[in-house]
Amino acid sequence: AFDRLFITSSSKTKLGFPEVNLGIMPGYGGSGRAYGRIGTKAVLDMMVTGRPIGSMDAIKTGLADELVGDADDLDEAMRKWIIGCKGEKPILIQLETVVDATEIVAARDKYLKRLRADHTPAPAAIIDHVENFGHDKSAMSAGEIEVFPNLMVSSASKNLRRVFYLTDAVRRSARGASNIKRLHVVGAG
């Protein structure tokens, strides 16, 4: 865990939890740390959809602490912050970790009604995880140990990881010059 998160203002800077796209959930305590920083609604949206957020949204939600111009400015910003601490242990501001039942119900309605649990078990498992362990950041991080392995060995996760590797292979093979001289499209109507 970090005492302070610095990010660049580049449009390429993205923060998120893409694990759901592989049929798993965040691990290594990430769900608990993020939940403590941004609360139920925001963490569920990020973890269940797998959509990343840009640097400005990360600052607004509290996922990141400080925005710098570009990667070259990171060292100087961190140095200034460390000098400003003067040996004191920094205080990381945490939100109250109280699970809001209405947000859990809203998340189930919003995210799960279009999904088949046997094809994509991770979103439901993530919502259950927040509901069961969200009362305590430490319990939430420890709860990952119960949930993550079951998702990892599921057939849905295995298939989603296979799709990821195949898609990545197609992207890599599509790079470079093409020797195609003529192309016909049949049945494009």
Give the positions of each predicted feature:
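Amphipathic alpha-helical segments at domain termini/boundaries
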Residues: 1-3, 7, 41-139, 143-147, ...
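Mobile "lid/hinge" segments at catalytic clefts and subdomain interfaces of large enzymes
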Residues: 21-24
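Basic, glycine-/proline-tolerant helical and adjacent loop/strand elements
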Residues: 18
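Glycine-rich adenosine-cofactor-binding loop
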Residues: 174-189
